[in-house]
């Protein structure tokens, strides 16, 4: 909704839409798409003195058509034939540098397609004359200034969107929405979908089990718990319905029985 209200495809809100849509699939770490400040690029410096840009660049995305052919010239027209995107992490926190993950396009829900959002980010950056080897998450203000996305800006945009949907949200609850929310959200979505821990770790690039701290007791999980015991519940009800009436009556009368406080310990090997 926030993106729909934007008058420019190069606005911060439009960039946010693409980052969120892609983020719900790949669960990016903040440094992988944003900068600490709006005008300076964050780099990692190796002991040798070599530096590498932390955030995604256009060069990290390879777009493929339905026949697995690389789409060299990505435009608003050729974007229609994009069927998948291969994303490469040149550098990341877990040190699995060079890791690649391929995402398939969601043709059923194009507005939520991570592949189209990734393509839009590349097209936007090139439209803003951003070199392919420089950070991809860039937008243009109404005054024509080109700025990098930051963690603070992400939090501001996310909280603004949440307030539009939930105007009664408390000042304390709104603080839970931050740039890190994207990684948490991606993790929760896969957990709700019933994916295994190994699957979650593989697709969201976790080496250990630290992702478990992000799992939430969501409504989806709660209903899954009920559904998981549905057959067992039915079996119990079938068993109860098959009991003789006198046994059922006896069980009902026993529910009102209380413990005799005067009775001492009663020794018996069986409960």
Where are these regions (language model features)?
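Extended, non-catalytic subsegments within catalytic or DNA/protein-binding/adaptor domains
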Residues: 1-271
């Amino acid at each position: 909704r926030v993106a729909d209200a934007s008058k420019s495809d190069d606005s911060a809100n439009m960039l946010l839409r693409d980052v969120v849509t892609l983020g719900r699939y790949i669960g990016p770490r903040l440094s992988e798409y944003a900068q600490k400040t709006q005008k300076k690029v964050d780099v990692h410096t190796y002991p040798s003195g070599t530096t590498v840009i932390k955030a995604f660049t256009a060069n990290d995305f390879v777009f493929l058509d339905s026949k697995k052919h690389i789409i060299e010239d990505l435009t608003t027209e050729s974007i229609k034939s994009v069927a998948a995107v291969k994303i490469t992490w040149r550098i990341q926190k877990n040190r699995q540098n060079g890791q690649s993950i391929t995402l398939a396009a969601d043709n059923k829900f194009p507005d939520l397609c991570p592949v189209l959002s990734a393509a839009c980010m590349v097209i936007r950056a090139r439209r803003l004359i951003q070199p392919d080897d420089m950070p991809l998450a860039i937008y243009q203000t109404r005054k024509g200034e080109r700025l990098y996305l930051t963690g603070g800006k992400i939090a501001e945009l996310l909280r603004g969107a949440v307030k539009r949907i939930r105007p009664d949200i408390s000042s304390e609850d709104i603080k839970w929405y931050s740039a890190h929310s994207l990684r948490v959200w991606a993790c929760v979505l896969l957990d709700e979908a019933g994916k295994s821990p190994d699957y979650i770790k593989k697709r969201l690039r976790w080496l250990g089990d630290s992702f478990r701290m992000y799992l939430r007791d969501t409504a989806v999980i709660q209903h899954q718990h009920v559904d998981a015991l549905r057959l067992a519940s039915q079996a119990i009800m079938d068993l109860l319905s098959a009991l003789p009436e006198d046994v059922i009556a006896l069980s009902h009368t026993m529910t009102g029985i209380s413990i005799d406080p005067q009775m001492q310990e009663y020794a018996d090997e069986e409960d």
